[in-house]
């Protein structure tokens, strides 16, 4: 019965109410969904789909994640904004706050010589849009944290006329 009503609902969505009337089962209670591709409707659907779900109480999910309890309860995280890449002039990756975990014991793998660790969270980096979100997430999980404040670079004041000055270091002879 579920497969029949499912196909009728699909017919109704694709062909409208006329095709549903032809079907054997009446589906007057099934809501119709418009298959419109207008950008306004897509934007409305997207805002409805991206509502945040807030869970106030602290949930113990250690049995679900598979991470040992010693790696969850005794963690220290560092919350920071990454520095700008010196090889590029853009500042795109400096707007998000990142959270990374402290390093635990590592050893050298005797077979291959690779660095090994028993810590599943050692290479995990979490990204947040605000510092408050990162701090709230660390507190919710019971981790101690250090926050490194954002370093705002001071702009150097330069005048355009200094580019054409005669006694610039590039024009002064060194011999």
Swiss-Prot record:
GO cellular component, one term: mitochondrial inner membrane
Record carries keyword Oxidoreductase: no
Main subcellular localisation: mitochondrion
Signal peptide stretch: none
Membrane topology according to the record: Peripheral membrane protein
UniProt region (Disordered), positions on chain: 150-175
Tree of life domain: Eukaryota
Entry annotated with the keyword Transit peptide: yes
Compartments where found: Mitochondrion inner membrane
Transit peptide, residues from-to: 1-42
Keywords attached to this entry: Electron transport, Membrane, Mitochondrion, Mitochondrion inner membrane, Respiratory chain, Transit peptide, Transport
Pfam family, one: NDUS4
GO biological process, one term: electron transport chain
Known function: Accessory subunit of the mitochondrial membrane respiratory chain NADH dehydrogenase (Complex I), that is believed not to be involved in catalysis. Complex I functions in the transfer of electrons from NADH to the respiratory chain. The immediate electron acceptor for the enzyme is believed to be ubiquinone.
Subunit structure: Complex I is composed of 45 different subunits. This is a component of the iron-sulfur (IP) fragment of the enzyme.
Family label: Belongs to the complex I NDUFS4 subunit family.
Name of this protein: NADH dehydrogenase [ubiquinone] iron-sulfur protein 4, mitochondrial
Organism: Gekko japonicus (Schlegel's Japanese gecko)
Phylogenetic classification of the source organism: Eukaryota, Metazoa, Chordata, Craniata, Vertebrata
